[in-house]
Amino acid sequence: MSEIPADLYYTSEHEWVLRTGDDTVRVGITDYAQSALGDVVFVQLPDVGADVASGDAFGEVESTKSVSDLYAPVTAKVVAVNGDLEGSPELVNSDPYGEGWLVDLRVEAGTLDEALGGLLDAEGYRAVVTE
């Protein structure tokens, strides 16, 4: 069974979301997703400063098996990207909830609670991956 940390939020597209501040989150892909993808060989991320809309593709993860879109869990501005993935995309496989994070996002002030309320908790995500 894939690791599903209880302190994170999730999307049905297999992204995880960690609240990092009053209006900021860190985003990555889940253990389930990296396992299904196989060995990650390339990660395409947006530029810092880019605006992303909830549910829209913002990048790609390429593995030895396939190329998969990454979807924004919330509408926000990209405030940081994980530059380590350029030279070490395998971090997505080896540490999906840590060193393999993808982007940091900042939402409009005062909207994060509502945005996170639309995401899945660990139990909700577990139901998605066991269907």
Swiss-Prot record:
Note on how the cofactor is bound: Binds 1 lipoyl cofactor covalently.
Annotated SUPFAM superfamilies: Single hybrid motif
Segments forming domain Lipoyl-binding: 24-106
InterPro entries: Biotin_lipoyl, GCV_H, GCV_H/Fam206, GCV_H_sub, Single_hybrid_motif
Record's keyword terms, sorted: Lipoyl
Biological process per Gene Ontology, one example term: glycine decarboxylation via glycine cleavage system
Subunit organization: The glycine cleavage system is composed of four proteins: P, T, L and H.
Function field: The glycine cleavage system catalyzes the degradation of glycine. The H protein shuttles the methylamine group of glycine from the P protein to the T protein.
Protein name: Glycine cleavage system H protein
Organism: Mycolicibacterium smegmatis (strain ATCC 700084 / mc(2)155)
Protein encoded by which gene: gcvH
